[in-house]
Amino acid sequence: MKRFLKRLYRYLFCRKGYGVHSPFVFDLITNVLEERHGYYAYTELKAARLMLQDAAKMKNAVKRQSLSRHECEWLFRLANRFKPCRIIMVGSGAGLIPLSLTSYASGGLHGIALEQDAVMANVARSLLRERATSPVEVRYETYEVSLPKALAEFGHPDCIVLDEITGALSALLRCCAGYIHEDTLLIVRGIDASPEANEAWRTACAFPSATVSIDACTWGIVFFRPGLPRKTFGHVVC
């Protein structure tokens, strides 16, 4: 009930940039997160979601980690605005997270999607093989091993996504801290899943170089751009 009331309040009073005095955040909310313009990529993302449903009959694990239409679309819009070229995803949302974040371009970027579940890794590979327009490599290994390798390979990734990492979120955030630069976009899914996840989210917002952060109920977004206000803004995007 508490989560529902929080979402309802945000939906009624925190949309359309109401009460936001930062030009950067106002533009982000009104022209990216809440944009209603249609994109060709939306058709491809819809087809990918249907492909998942048909292929797996939405088995519990796939259904639980899959993304909604709204989630796919705003992730696409976010990537389309900030154009990340080196993307690391810890968890793949059954392949929909890398697909959504890379569909803005047909080349010139590289994504690494990490999975520590063999079934989810295979689901993501199959989906991306059929639908991805940019190269995304799916790696199957424990996150504690695969994430440091991916971070060292990219050096300073443009986008890091942590997808509902139960129990290990704080440790993985600490692992990422030394690789974040001012243009890095940090996206965390499941910040309201548990008290531990919410505490880890607050830790990310408190990184020394963190500036604007968006608490969107289920998802969190952190920017590290100098000159922006060091503040967390409440919103809801899905």
Regions found by a protein language model. Give the residues of each.
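A short alpha-helical cap/connector motif
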Residues: 1-159, 164-185, 192-238
